[in-house]
Amino acid sequence: MYTLEEIKNQLGLKSEKKSIVFPEAESEIIQSVAKTLVDEKLGLPILLFKSSKEVPSEIKNNSSIKTICLDEFDTKEFEEEFVKLRKGKATIEVAHQVMQLPNYIGAMLVKLNQADCMLSGLNNTTADTIRPALQIIGTKPGYNIASSIFVMSKGNENYIFTDCALNIKPTSEQLVEITQMAVDFAKALNVKNVEAALLSYSTNGSGKGEDVDRVHQAVEILKSKEKDYVCEGEIQFDAAFDKKTRDKKFKNCSLLKQTPDIFVFPDINAGNIGYKIAQRMGGFEAIGPFVLGLNQPVNDLSRGATFVDVLNTAIMTLYLSY
């Protein structure tokens, strides 16, 4: 799996730079990240300010940072496009209201190819970031949902945890999509021979219940598809994580690596708790979340994100836009 430093180096070598829109330009962290992206030749930031009075002189005087001030921005084209996209679900009056919100402007910039990707969430909820993306940018063909992943990193260990942030209790069919999105993400990061474990409190029928059936059915659907990766489940975390334990608990398991690349959690409770245990008790760095399944990259920040968190997420978002 590519490290962040390797991804950063790849961005620096790209002759054509991608643009990333930040709807929360009033944040000093966002402004610092924008300057860093320019200084290190990683991407082209677009900063959305609510008012022209908010734009600091060092941003205003930096010709490599584009600014858009909503108090001076004509939203008519965006409002008309929003009404078309919503197909009768929004009037022009509703469109006018939502186009006063920076996240909606940012998503529309991406939709109309005036920006390549978007990063928000430092001062907004996940819903406030993802809702405009779903309404305007939409999901990729073949997907009915968006999903999220964290890259859990410690030394040479790198794992993908999904879905820890978006889907509360996914159906079997949604778990299939969540797994497929995570596999595609792993491949984009140069993971070879991808393996995914679909987690449960049961290993290969050792436990019973509706939640076990939901995961087991997802695995059956995945195994029925033609694919170039390995998936297995339902499986408990200890068996998934450690091959010796797996060999005892799950005979003829198709997972061959010591530890699989992807851990698919059965619901948001397990995923959210799981990544935070790995982070706080296990000493893993949680990079993300990254939103998957959208037509163009939009990512969501934690409201407690630091400069480094925002920069790393911006770098990954730009990388995914190529």
UniProtKB/Swiss-Prot annotation:
Its main location: cytoplasm. GO terms for molecular function: phosphate acetyltransferase activity. It is an enzyme of class 2 (transferase). GO terms for cellular component: cytoplasm. The keyword Acyltransferase applies. It comes from the Bacteria. This is Phosphate acetyltransferase. It comes from Mycoplasma capricolum subsp. capricolum (strain California kid / ATCC 27343 / NCTC 10154). Pathway: Metabolic intermediate biosynthesis; acetyl-CoA biosynthesis; acetyl-CoA from acetate: step 2/2. It holds the Pfam family PTA_PTB.
